[in-house]
Amino acid sequence: MQREEWFHRAVIYQVDSSLFYDANGDGFGDLAAIRQKLHYIRSLGATVLWLTPFYLTPLQDDGYDISDHLQPDPRFGTIADVIELIARARELGLRVIVELVIQHTSAQHPWFQAARRDPRSPWRPYYLWADRPPENDDPPMFPGVEESVWRWDEQAGQYYRHMFYHHEPDLNLAHPPVIAEIENIITFWLQAGVSGFRLDAASHLVKQAGKGDETRGYPLLTHLRQVVQRLNPDAILLGEVDVAVEDYRHYFGQGDRLQMVLNFWLNKYLYLSLAQQRAAPVVKALQAMVTPPDGCCFVNWLRNHDELDLEGIGERNKRQVIRTFAPDKSMSVYQRGVRRRLAPMLDGDTRRIALAHAILLALPGVPVMRYGDEIGMGDDLSLPERYAVRTPMQWSAAANAGFSRAARDDLPVKPVASGRFRYQRINVETALRHPRSLLHRVRNMVLARTEYTEPGSLPFTLLTLKPDAVLGLLYRSESREVLMLANCSQQAVEVLLPPLAEGYWSPILEDKLYQDGLHGGKDARLALSGYGYRWFSRSLS
């Protein structure tokens, strides 16, 4: 049985710092406002708050273009606001993790500006330069937006490398002074009280550290882990790792690198299951996954702040997911993914959105919820690229969705105000008034998951079920067994279960009131409604 750490029991809630709530009325979300909404986040059952970047930034890439890693952008607040937010969160039982964006900086960062001016500058080797771009380098991350990962800089008289946007030059992660700067960043924020970091673009920075060879770059993760653990043994590193399934093991190491890894592999196959209304794709993905080392785990989610990346599941499967969830060309991006939020992808069907959450919370690993998914927020396809899924939180039917008291024209990003997902219809205040709303369903699921934490750290057993629309996962601890079932199909079914332990299985969570119960033994059968889910437990004492 795996050693259980505090994060194995976690439920993470991701907040876009600029879009969650605006306390001072300038139209821009801020840290003081997030502090005011901590009770809401905690009421959902969340135990960890993940903040997207709030550092000094030109804001050309939603804050991931950082010009000072140690200073909050004044639009978000001050370092005092950060410390107060962390302290208040801790009082409520919430830990706070922040972004560690070290694969690149903003082109406006003082390091890059100094590097451009003088080839003899000590900051010149902080970045990757070339007189002529290599012929066989990686393609750009944003095809159709960027033509190459190399950009000519007139002032520097050389090309610089940028894996992402041209205004985000890549750091030279094989250069010791850069690593020393990163150590200072980690130290600063751990001393401020954060409980860990989400390591942005982890697979790309490994390649940079190894000068194109991932094998030589993995030790950087070991080093970062050592730095973090030396300062706070409880702090975590959560890595953004989109790689082939067999390569995840390198990011865990022997349990001495990343403790938590975002499971892009499983996320892609989850959407294939939802598109096909069959459990088989998720089953296939789970069977292929590596087992995390002791003290480590995968992290699962439904949708994040980027596109749904479908690379790696095969062209035919990718086309099927896109055809199902992004039938219009405007819904796809970068030739690889879907730029929609969860609720519009599932046609606003509360049953189906609830099912997706039930699957998320049943999967082995730690769940992440993105702000707004719990109420079924929509997207704004008039916004470019990934910004379609980055709109203000919808708190009420009041002006600006209750997000800000600023004039609507003063909002940098406006709430969704038309269509079936408009804020006048989809908002927290309205959802709280209806006992069967998606918000209440998701909250009940999460609260159940925080009590039945077996998926966070225990090995799972995949059940062979008929019909194949139903996903079945069984977890066993020293004191109980937990059975989780989910029907991916819109058709009601009767599930034939494999032999289970004799005795009565107590219901934990159900999508509706069912007339039948579960007793173990052979040939047990259970009813499941279309997009239904049922969780059970059985004591071993």
Residue ranges and their predicted role:
Residues M1-S541:
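Active-site and adjacent substrate-binding regions of carbohydrate-active enzymes
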